[in-house]
């Protein structure tokens, strides 16, 4: 089932026009800063890049002084940013335009529900489907919050461009405002002077909730219910969308995530959503001026209104306003209690920290309300359900006395939001590496005199010992007075905080704990021991779900055996039963790709889902998958709709979670229109995959799978032969890419590696992919693909036709190849060659020739299977986008190469080193999916 492409004949023309205008204003701002003579050099560089005169471009840039590099780096970093804004505006405009012409245009969701309505269990499907985008703070979001705020203002202005052309908006004022903000952004630091802290990441991601996500999720849920109702399917409390969060709870490899950051993350989230509720109540208060002299109200509404402290004579006859006043005051008191606790012992954070956050998140008028009522000891809501019940009293009174129309709008949206977000906004995941859990459990067992050297036990001995502790002894191991290591204290503190947050904000604030590098059943039991220490798990129930993360090719291959053993235990079945019979499993796209290459990773993940789904069915358990996808193809990225619908049939029961990372968050959720569209696609894709079997012939799919097994084996061998067996590859990567500079870039709180990097396997997947994007090879998204297909076709010429059939009929294979097509189009081997020249020896530089040959072979094979003459034939929008952006951000690669040369030859003063970071930022912005 295809979905509508957002494209029209006017798109390229209008974007070209807008980009021309934005470039003109940027030219003016730049010229004003440096003068006409210096600006001539920028114009020359633009001309050389536009005509693909790489020799002239290289010579011109190498002749620039370090001081001249400053303005050149800034200019060509900001230009791709402005192009992105134009594309985002055009997307938002077309969403609205097409919706106005045809209500069902974006009606991908409408079409999906039409299909589902024909199923016998339609209501059950629609009632229980749940898609969870999980926002993360991996180091791929390179834009500063300040820059994002400025681009948001430019975005809002550019959205009025068509109205300006039509004479509806004053052109002179609009133009002056646009000129002003572009002038400001040209003089604003685009990179961070200091590395982000976890608390910065928390507040940064909250901007997306305030800007778009809360309203988009609420609106989409209401639309979902309405579309189902049109088909005669009346849903009770569906949650097609809920949100997840890693920031503050993901401590895998990040020593800066602690109990305090987990607490802060939960508190800030709570403040953001309660703030939203208070603002909506203000709207309702202003609008609901019904007089008791002109309409009747229910006794329950009168009781609610009479509790208000609003004693104004002007409100005596306005019970709805008084009711909303009381609800608002009670909600503000709830917020204050959450911030500082209802007693000193329950304080979340210090009063100074609370004051800082209030200043950021609470509007001045709400802060005033808080000040007024703080000494009154007003009641607060214990739960979000209590708050909802008060809102329902208002609704019932309106409906009872014929005011149904007043329920629609703000009140209905507010009730809907409370259903979705509660007082917690998004579920925070916890994550830690399995080795840390093992070290902590080993220490606990030793201090309790149970076993001196737990780590030396066999897997069977470990499981027997841990099972006994979990089922037979209710006591905690940490109750002894033995001294604890700093690591153990830190881990126990974060688990204890998790329990406190669940007690205070509700169970859904934290539902999962993910175990990185899960390699055995004991890895999961070790986490259970830690959870038991703070009362989050016992012999009968689990308040937090244990989620294994299978990352490497080997671990994915072993996942079936591991989960078969794990699900065999009666204790585990009890835990799963307390989670509505769901067992979540996380799949790692990044590490499996770095381990075996793109084809091997994709196919291993596909097979693992098939096998794990069957294991769940055999045990009467619903296996749900959490897809740890990044922005790039090398990390599982690509178009979301195609990515989801290409999963194995049956692998999506009714729930799916997936990570949304870095700059992908800005691209997808930077404004409400884009957020609505992208979230709609996630829901539609998930339901489509649940109910639609793309290939109905089982023999055909078996044949396709057998073919893939052979192809992937060859691809994996070719990939590993270069990455792990070639003695010069390690040096090539570190010398012919900006990995060293990427590692020092202040783009996230997490280190680039878990330890000192001495081999490729020790490098985190994100900087690995990020660096290959910077040098424009895009290596993780295609290497090994061409050789594998060539080898298969050489065995039998008829195999090409078989691959072409697979591309046409199998969504998984089609998505796989389409993604390779896309990354090849973003690569540039002329630029990559210049990076290769940075390598110190001929042997190291020669690695590039191996890569280049595979790149050309992969391109030839992809085009042959797709039966296309050129890349991106099926994606004209991306083709057009690259046409007008590549000439500008290609320049940044040449600037970056020259700066790296100067840095490595000690010709770049410390003051100018940050220019490399500016180019990294600009290239990532131009590519739009850096890591």
Swiss-Prot record:
EC category name: lyase
Superkingdom of this protein's organism: Bacteria
Pfam family, one: PEPcase
Active site: 138, 594
Record key words, sorted: Carbon dioxide fixation, Lyase, Magnesium
GO molecular-function terms, A-Z: magnesium ion binding; phosphoenolpyruvate carboxylase activity
Required cofactor(s): Mg(2+)
GO CC aspect terms: cytosol
Reaction catalysed by this enzyme: oxaloacetate + phosphate = phosphoenolpyruvate + hydrogencarbonate
Biological-process GO terms, alphabetical: carbon fixation; oxaloacetate metabolic process; tricarboxylic acid cycle
EC number(s) per entry: 4.1.1.31
InterPro entries linked to this entry: PEP_COase, PEP_COase_bac/pln-type, PEP_COase_Lys_AS, PEPCASE_His_AS, Pyrv/PenolPyrv_kinase-like_dom
Family to which this protein belongs: Belongs to the PEPCase type 1 family.
General function of this protein: Forms oxaloacetate, a four-carbon dicarboxylic acid source for the tricarboxylic acid cycle.
Name this protein carries in UniProt: Phosphoenolpyruvate carboxylase
Gene encoding the protein: ppc
